[in-house]
Design a protein with these regions (language model features):
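Short, compact, well-ordered microdomains
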Residues: 51-89
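Compact soluble domain cores
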Residues: 1-58
């Protein structure tokens, strides 16, 4: 799995160590299928995507702002994950 930060996330991580720690914790939660602040329907869609393929989405309210973690399966069967501010979506 490749993980990418948007410019906004990258800039905030570079200047804010607390936020950087929150991002690491969010990634750990995501890897453990803790989808954060999603409704039950979106969480169920993630569970189906794990079994049958598709996009995964998580949302976490951090100290600076809400962030999304989104994973897509590419045509090369490689998981690509992007972390972005909700405002960047």
């Amino acid at each position: 799995m490749r993980i990418y930060f948007t410019r906004g996330i990258n800039d905030e991580v570079a200047k804010n160590t607390q936020f950087a720690k929150e991002i690491v914790e969010s990634i750990k939660r995501y890897c453990n299928h803790d989808w954060g602040d999603l409704c039950a329907e979106d969480k169920e869609m993630n569970e189906k995507a794990l079994k049958h393929g598709g996009r995964l989405l998580a949302a976490y309210k951090l100290s600076v702002a809400k962030v999304y973690i989104i994973t897509d399966d590419t045509k090369a069967n490689e998981w690509v994950t992007t972390i972005l501010f909700a405002s960047e979506y």
